[in-house]
């Protein structure tokens, strides 16, 4: 064993005898574990004659390996145990990752290694999976982010691999060809071996235990020396300075930057830069853009990363397309002011980058090499003369069809214009307050309306709160307003001695809405609808569903008919005189069910999509426990039936979900070939036939599923923020201690209980809410 690498009290790195590089993280407070395996090969390494081969192999791997086929393969095995799993194929890497309860980490890792080392590659399964890739390609052909990336690739030098087709589709995957099958196996043999892989493991197990798990599971991964990877081709010079892309949604400006002197963990600096960029405090960039009527928001994204180079995209949402030049000038003026003291300003933002609580997200940060030092020099390449401008507009004169990265775009050239000189602005970079010595506290406030308030009203008030949220964040307080159908909630988490200073002005702002809130709300609502239109049809339906589960409220501009309740943890209750609405006096009960079938349609372009949401028929603990267990049983079967057997599409799922203020079973599907009525028919048939499978469920398997569900429900949250959010979820769902009661009920569930719960589901006792695209 080669123990030459880094040592840390809670982490350790080593190399296994077969050459696999291993990174271990001991997380003693965790109850769940996670694994992340990276293959140092991706789409840019595949043979040019077979575009999509790397992505296709990623899909095929999930169909199982020699030791764990069928329902024992990783994905369905994890789903019934409440785990999560996914994968991602990029240009130079392919990642496979999952999380599960700690006791199942070893068994999950064995399945992961089996499917990567010994994929079955059955030709009939390949044909079925090729249709899944075709459905994924068709869905991505209308996906905003995919099309933006393809348009940015048009600006790169000719021959850069980002301009090649890599997603894969039916026509690019010649399964019947001996040459393709040979290339598939050669690609697997060349790259899926221990010397070309790294594995990260994280869990409550000791470092020695984690290492033993890896040794046992990874012994069968073939050992070979890592191959040398050629340096990536340069991103510069850009093929053009500016381009316009026709895309639904509000007008936007994307500034693309080529970075070519990055170091391994410069993502830390990019995260700090994104935090500073998105600051809504007075005097900052977003505040100035809003005051000048130029822009609404900004998002930073790494489009491509390979060795020392990256393509960075900053997307600004504009109030009007004509504001692009002025906005760009303001951004570079702000950036120039930032550079005067970049090191201290970026370092000051680092404490605001809260450590993620989700196991997979924590492990992802380790994969990225985080936490790491701030290095402002990596931002030196953000210059106007190294910038590719992409204008996004729903209406574009003179557009022509062009293909890039395998996707058809509607683009137009943009004449180079001399940079607009910005008026020098007195930029203010607010510094975070020193850390507080006080304990953390939490405050959750909820208002219940007699119906679903107008979306425009919520958006106007949320925007009015944003400067206050920005100020609170500088003091370590996370504050946000959320719409949950008939309920609105305001949440605050942070040092208990700073909560009152944050909540009091926020409540005053809610009571005294800005005088222009109606007009501003309508503008924001219109922009949100246009923004939503750029997403996948299934995503548009998911965004709309919470607001459709209740009766719309006639427009009001006061709080007189609202009732409120609250949950306070390690903090002081706000003075009731500050609060909008009337105190409920006790905890507001969950909303009552609305039995029967309710059908809504939404005008959505693109493929057919349909959601079926079945809220709980009662708030009884045994009923909810049974429905949660039903969800775990239905999830892999739903995927197998609709995705694998019926070949309906790529985007589909089912599970137990919270939708607005209601909880229940949610089924979702998007299809390029089946109409909404047909999708609903397939879902109904699936649910009707599921009773037969439930009746035949072996007692031993039921016992294992009961225990896995109970263990998840009893899982103790690690951080205070996790404990507070769980307490709030219990408050909304029926009261304190509900998770413990659900765990106890889960352990007592019988097969007859599941059959009874399935019958209640089929009878629509809690309601069947069907939301579909209009076809």
From Swiss-Prot:
Its cofactor is Zn(2+). It holds the Pfam family PqqF-like_C_4. Its EC number is 3.4.24.-. The active site is at residue 58. The keyword Transmembrane does not apply. GO terms for biological process: proteolysis; pyrroloquinoline quinone biosynthetic process. InterPro entries: Metalloenz_LuxS/M16, Pept_M16_N, Pept_M16_Zn_BS, Peptidase_M16, Peptidase_M16_C, PQQ_synth_PqqF, PqqF-like_C_4, PqqF_C_3. Binds 1 zinc ion per subunit. GO terms for molecular function: metalloendopeptidase activity; metallopeptidase activity; zinc ion binding. Pathway: Cofactor biosynthesis; pyrroloquinoline quinone biosynthesis. Keywords: Hydrolase, Metal-binding, Metalloprotease, PQQ biosynthesis, Protease, Zinc. It is an enzyme of class 3 (hydrolase). Zn(2+) binds at residues 55, 59, 136. GO terms for cellular component: cytoplasm; periplasmic space. Required for coenzyme pyrroloquinoline quinone (PQQ) biosynthesis. It is thought that this protein is a protease that cleaves peptides bond in a small peptide (gene pqqA), providing the glutamate and tyrosine residues which are necessary for the synthesis of PQQ. Belongs to the peptidase M16 family. PANTHER family: INSULIN-DEGRADING ENZYME-RELATED, NARDILYSIN. This is Coenzyme PQQ synthesis protein F. It comes from Pseudomonas aeruginosa (strain ATCC 15692 / DSM 22644 / CIP 104116 / JCM 14847 / LMG 12228 / 1C / PRS 101 / PAO1).
């Amino acid at each position: 064993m080669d123990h030459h690498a880094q040592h840390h009290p809670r982490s350790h790195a080593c190399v296994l005898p077969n050459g696999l590089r291993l990174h271990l993280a001991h997380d003693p407070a965790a109850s769940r574990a996670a694994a992340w395996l990276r293959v140092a090969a991706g789409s840019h390494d595949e043979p040019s004659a077979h575009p999509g081969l790397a992505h296709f192999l990623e899909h095929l791997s999930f169909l199982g390996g020699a030791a764990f086929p069928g329902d024992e393969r990783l994905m369905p095995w994890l789903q019934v145990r409440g785990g999560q799993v996914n994968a991602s194929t990029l240009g130079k890497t392919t990642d496979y990752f999952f999380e599960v309860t700690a006791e199942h980490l070893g068994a999950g890792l064995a399945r992961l290694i089996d499917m990567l080392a010994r994929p079955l590659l059955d030709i009939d399964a390949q044909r079925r999976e090729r249709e899944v890739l075709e459905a994924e390609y068709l869905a991505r052909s209308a996906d905003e982010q995919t099309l933006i990336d393809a348009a940015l690739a048009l600006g790169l030098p000719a021959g850069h691999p980002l301009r090649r087709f890599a997603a894969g589709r039916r026509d690019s995957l010649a399964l019947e060809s001996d040459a393709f099958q040979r290339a598939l196996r050669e690609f697997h043999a060349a790259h899926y071996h221990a010397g070309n892989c790294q594995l990260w493991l994280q869990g409550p197990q000791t470092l020695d235990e984690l290492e033993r798990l890896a040794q046992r599971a990874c012994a069968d991964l073939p050992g070979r020396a890592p191959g040398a990877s050629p340096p990536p081709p340069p991103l510069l010079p850009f093929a053009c300075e500016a381009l316009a892309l026709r895309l639904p949604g509000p007008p936007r400006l994307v500034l693309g930057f080529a970075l070519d002197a990055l170091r391994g963990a410069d993502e830390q600096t990019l995260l700090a830069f994104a935090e500073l960029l998105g600051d809504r405090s007075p005097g900052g960039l977003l505040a100035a853009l809003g005051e000048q009527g130029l822009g609404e928001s900004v998002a930073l994204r790494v489009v491509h990363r390979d060795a020392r180079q990256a393509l960075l995209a900053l997307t600004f949402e504009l109030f009007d397309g004509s504001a692009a030049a002025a906005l760009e000038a303001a951004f570079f003026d702000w950036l120039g002011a930032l550079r005067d003291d970049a090191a201290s300003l970026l370092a000051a933002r680092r404490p605001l980058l809260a450590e993620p609580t989700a196991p997979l997200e924590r492990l992802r940060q380790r994969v990225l090499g985080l936490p790491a030092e701030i290095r402002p020099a990596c931002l030196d390449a953000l210059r106007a003369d190294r910038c590719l401008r992409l204008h996004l507009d729903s209406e574009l004169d003179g557009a022509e069809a062009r293909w890039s990265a395998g996707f058809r775009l509607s683009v137009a050239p943009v004449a180079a214009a001399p940079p607009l000189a910005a008026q020098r602005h007195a930029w203010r970079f607010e510094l975070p307050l020193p850390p507080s010595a006080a304990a953390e506290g939490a405050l959750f406030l909820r208002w219940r309306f007699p119906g679903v308030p107008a979306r425009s009203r919520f958006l106007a008030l949320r925007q009015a709160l944003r400067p206050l949220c920005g100020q609170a964040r500088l003091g370590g307080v996370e504050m946000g307003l959320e719409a949950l159908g008939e309920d609105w909630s305001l949440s605050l988490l942070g040092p208990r001695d700073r909560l009152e200073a944050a909540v009091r002005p926020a409540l005053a702002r809610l009571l005294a809405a800005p005088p222009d809130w109606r007009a501003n709300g309508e503008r924001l609502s219109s922009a949100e609808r246009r923004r939503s239109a750029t997403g996948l049809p299934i995503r548009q339906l998911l965004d709309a569903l919470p607001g459709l589960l209740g009766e719309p409220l006639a427009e009001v501009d006061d709080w007189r008919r609202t009732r409120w309740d609250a949950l306070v943890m390690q903090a002081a209750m706000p003075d009731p005189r500050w609060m909008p609405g009337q105190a409920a006096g006790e905890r507001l009960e969950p909303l009552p069910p609305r039995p029967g079938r309710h059908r809504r349609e939404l005008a959505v372009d693109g493929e057919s999509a349909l959601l079926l949401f079945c809220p709980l028929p009662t708030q009884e603990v045994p009923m909810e426990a049974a429905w949660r267990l039903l969800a775990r049983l239905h999830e892999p079967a739903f995927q197998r039936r609709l995705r694998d057997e019926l070949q309906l599409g790529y985007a589909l799922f089912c599970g137990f979900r919270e939708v607005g203020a209601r909880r229940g079973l949610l089924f979702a599907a998007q299809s390029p070939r089946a109409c909404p009525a047909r999708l609903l028919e397939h879902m109904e048939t699936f649910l009707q036939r599921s009773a037969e499978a439930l009746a035949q469920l072996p007692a031993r398997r039921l016992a294992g599923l009961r225990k896995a569900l109970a263990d998840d429900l009893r899982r103790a949250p690690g951080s205070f923020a996790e404990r507070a959010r769980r307490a709030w979820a219990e408050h909304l769902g029926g009261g304190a201690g509900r998770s413990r009661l659900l765990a106890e009920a889960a352990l007592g569930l019988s097969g007859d209980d599941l059959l009874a719960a399935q019958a209640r589901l089929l009878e629509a006792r809690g309601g069947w809410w069907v939301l579909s695209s209009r076809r």
